[in-house]
Regions:
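Bacterial Sec-dependent N-terminal signal peptides
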Residues: 1-15
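C-terminal motif of bacterial Sec signal peptides marking the signal peptidase cleavage site
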Residues: 23-27
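Disordered, low-complexity segments in secreted/periplasmic proteins that are enriched in proline
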Residues: 28-67, 290-293, 349, 463-483
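N-terminal segments that cap or nucleate solenoid repeat domains
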Residues: 52-120, 449-457
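Extracellular beta-strand/beta-solenoid scaffold signature
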Residues: 65-67, 88-95, 116-129, 147-155, ...
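All-beta strand scaffolds that present successive hydrophobic residues in beta-strands
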Residues: 73-82, 100-105, 135-140, 161-167, ...
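Post-signal-peptide, soluble extracytosolic/periplasmic N-terminal scaffold domains
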Residues: 97-105, 110-149, 154-173, 180-193, ...
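Extracellular beta-solenoid/beta-roll
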Residues: 334-336, 353-458
Length: 483
């Protein structure tokens, strides 16, 4: 059965990499596989009794993560007592459909392809699939997929929960995420190692209908185009983990959704280009693509502690949406030649109103790098609790509206002439460093205090395409909504 290349997959790749700038348009590849009807599962053993070896493996995993860190797992680290395989297009290897199921110490191999939206939205062709309010507890697993639209572990629908720990996941096909959550499902993960190599294959991924994702510990790596480590149309929290992308952004947040990173080490090397919609690369992209997969509204990106290392381009890029960026004690290193923050129009939304509206809250934070806010964008920058900002804002002249508020004990050192709209600061908090600062066209006098007014942020609200509850018998995904 020849795999089809879906509109959704191509749009997904474009969304993840177009604004981020990346070199020739790439879509999911076609291939052939054995045919079969969708929806059946091939689990040979749904629960197992711990053996001595299994207990030792569990103990080692616990010890490895006791100090808040976790071991980078390989296949050989996990004791395997059972193997489950499925090569049929559209089918699953393990399914929990409205039931509670426990699976451990199992190798899961999934090949076969899917045509697209049914896999991305509703879980078709996933190796492991939970739906209809089912609960699936997984531990000490090895999960490998090799097919187009072959996600590894999928939680779909309100009331559905997947808990997975101390496991190794690998996907090698295009449009094949590691952890996938849609339709309001819940995914809880601890101490995983996930490697994805296909295009449009985020390690931690959500899609239409979103949900809640909690990840603690582990190593999550992507190497394909349009494959950030995290792609969020949900509320995703990651703590004490290592995230690495070698071709795409590190994090993408779309629409009215959020990503929170607690003590996370994130490295992003966005060095590939799929479209001419933008000429920028970045580590973190926050946007609204207007595909309907994410509701419109204010998003957020929060980073508490940890490190963010950007290898190429800008650190943050915000387009066609309003967002809060909250940074608290994070070490941010920009090793490329880009800037710290760019709020600007790109290829999505209505021309003239598709910029970025950013509220940047810096708490005990060091910010090093320039900021650019184009004429259809705006920025409210708050420097709090001893934060320092070294850089220029709109050094080429006045463009979008910018408000800067500097709390007592925080400072701004200019590295170039800067143009802002309004300023609140105590005396002595700004070091012009030989440059000029213009506030609404008036040159600021170094050493003086100022009182200004924040920019009002206008947030457009609308719902995305929701995913229907439930599913067909035997864990098949439901039909797509007629909208």
């Amino acid at each position: 059965m020849k795999a089809k290349v879906s509109r959704k997959c191509m749009v997904f790749i474009a969304i993840l990499s177009a604004i981020a700038t990346t070199v020739a348009f790439t879509s999911c590849s076609s291939g052939s596989s054995s045919s079969g009807s969708g929806g059946s599962s091939a689990v040979s053993q749904s629960s197992q009794t711990s053996t001595g070896d299994e207990a030792s493996s569990d103990k080692a995993a616990t010890e490895a993560s006791a100090d808040g860190s976790s071991k980078q797992l390989t296949e050989s680290d996990i004791t395997i007592n059972d193997t489950v395989e499925n090569s049929a297009d559209g089918e699953h290897a393990i399914t929990a459909d409205g039931e509670s199921k426990t699976v451990s110490n199992t190798l899961v191999n999934k090949t076969g392809d899917s045509s697209g939206d049914e896999a991305d939205f509703y879980g078709e062709n996933a190796a492991i699939f939970a739906t209809n309010g089912g609960t699936l507890d997984l531990s000490n697993m090895v999960v490998k997929t090799n097919g187009t639209h072959a996600n590894a572990v999928f939680s779909y629908g309100e009331g559905t929960t997947v808990n997975i720990s101390d496991s190794y996941i690998e996907t090698s096909g295009n449009c094949s995420g590691g952890l996938m959550t849609t339709g309001g499902g819940t995914m809880n993960a601890a101490n995983l190692t996930i490697n994805t190599s296909g295009n449009s294959s985020a390690a931690i991924r959500s899609d239409r209908g979103g949900g809640t994702v909690n990840v603690n510990g582990g190593y999550y790596t992507t190497s394909g185009k349009g494959s950030p480590v995290i792609y969020s149309t949900a509320d995703i929290t990651v703590s004490d983990a290592t995230l690495t992308s070698t071709a795409s952004q590190g994090v993408v947040v779309e629409g009215k959704n959020s990503v929170t990173l607690n003590n996370v080490d994130l490295t992003a090397d966005n060095n590939t280009k799929n479209s001419d919609k933008s000429s920028y690369y970045q580590a973190v992209m926050i946007n609204q693509s207007m595909s309907g997969d994410a509701a419109q509204g204010k998003s957020s990106f929060t980073m508490n502690g940890g490190t963010l290392t950007n290898k190429n381009g800008d650190v943050f890029f915000v387009n066609n949406t309003a967002t809060d960026i909250n940074l608290s004690g994070a070490q941010i290193k920009n090793e490329g030649d880009g800037i710290f923050l760019r709020a600007a129009a790109a290829g999505w939304g209505t021309e003239g109103s598709n910029g970025g509206q950013v509220t940047l809250n810096a708490t005990n934070q060091v910010i090093d790098g320039d900021m650019v806010v184009d004429k259809v964008s705006n920025l409210n920058l708050y420097l709090k609790s001893g934060s320092t900002f070294t850089g220029a804002i709109n050094s080429d002249g006045q463009a979008g509206e910018v408000y800067v508020e500097i709390e007592d004990g925080s400072t701004w050192t200019l590295t170039g002439d800067s143009y802002i709209t309004s300023l609140t600061c105590p005396a002595g908090s700004i070091n012009l460093n030989g440059h000029k600062l213009y506030v609404n066209g008036v040159e600021y006098k170094e050493g003086s205090a100022s009182t200004g007014t924040a920019i009002e942020v206008t947030v457009s609200e609308s719902s995305g395409h929701g995913a229907p509850d439930g599913g067909k018998p035997e864990g098949n995904p439901p039909a797509k909504p007629n909208n």
